[in-house]
Amino acid sequence: MAERGSDIRPGQILDHNGSLYLVVKTMHTQPGKGGAYIQAELKNLKTGAKYQERFRSDGYVKRAIVEEVEYQYIFGDGASLTLMNTATYEQVSISADMLGEKGVYLKEGIILTLSFYQGQVVAARVPDYVVLEVVETESVIKGQTASSSYKSAVLENGERISVPPFIKVGERIVVYTVDDTYYERAKD
């Protein structure tokens, strides 16, 4: 399926130069001279190699036709992950490397989205938003509110992110996994 270059988004899978690529990051650039373009970081799904590619905003790219299916994470042994289809209860094992650095968000029961191309799993991704507990954070000092200030916090998965000063140890927060940032307090 052909798509305009300006419509490329992270998480999409492109059929480019005869190979499948996962779009990792995109940035729209409009230089003073010449046409606008999209600078994209692509990951080759076969080799795992990453590279930069420019696509004209008014040009077209071929998007791979993939089937996306939700699977529930059951367990992992470090090298592979065992997942269960939430509709058919069929189990599948995938390489832990498919999630890359986003594997830190894995916990029992989380729903992952697997992308199938011609019957093979070609990509896996965690949800855009996950709920995690704060296990360690700095204490806030009164009077530090002249400008928007954030403090460092360690989450239950060991990740360190910046959170607003009102967040305390033991609170559950929503993390935006696309850029690993605080989104809001969990409403549970």
Swiss-Prot record:
Q: Does the keyword Transport apply?
A: no
Q: Where in the cell is it found?
A: Cytoplasm
Q: In which pathway does it act?
A: Protein biosynthesis; polypeptide chain elongation
InterPro entries from the entry?
Elong-fact-P_C, NA-bd_OB-fold, Rib_uL2_dom2, Transl_elong_fac_P/YeiP, Transl_elong_KOW-like, Transl_elong_P/YeiP_cen, Transl_elong_P/YeiP_CS, Transl_elongation_fac_P
Q: Which PROSITE patterns match?
A: EFP
Q: List the disulfide bonds.
A: none
Q: Which GO terms describe its molecular function?
A: translation elongation factor activity
Instruction: Output the Gene Ontology cellular-component terms.
Output: cytoplasm
**GO BP terms in the entry:** peptide biosynthetic process
Alphabetized SUPFAM superfamilies for the sequence: Nucleic acid-binding proteins, Translation proteins SH3-like domain
Where does the secretion signal sit in this chain? none
Q: What does this protein do?
A: Involved in peptide bond synthesis. Stimulates efficient translation and peptide-bond synthesis on native or reconstituted 70S ribosomes in vitro. Probably functions indirectly by altering the affinity of the ribosome for aminoacyl-tRNA, thus increasing their reactivity as acceptors for peptidyl transferase.
Protein name per the record: Elongation factor P
- The organism's lineage? Bacteria, Pseudomonadati, Pseudomonadota, Alphaproteobacteria, Rickettsiales
Give me the gene this protein comes from: efp
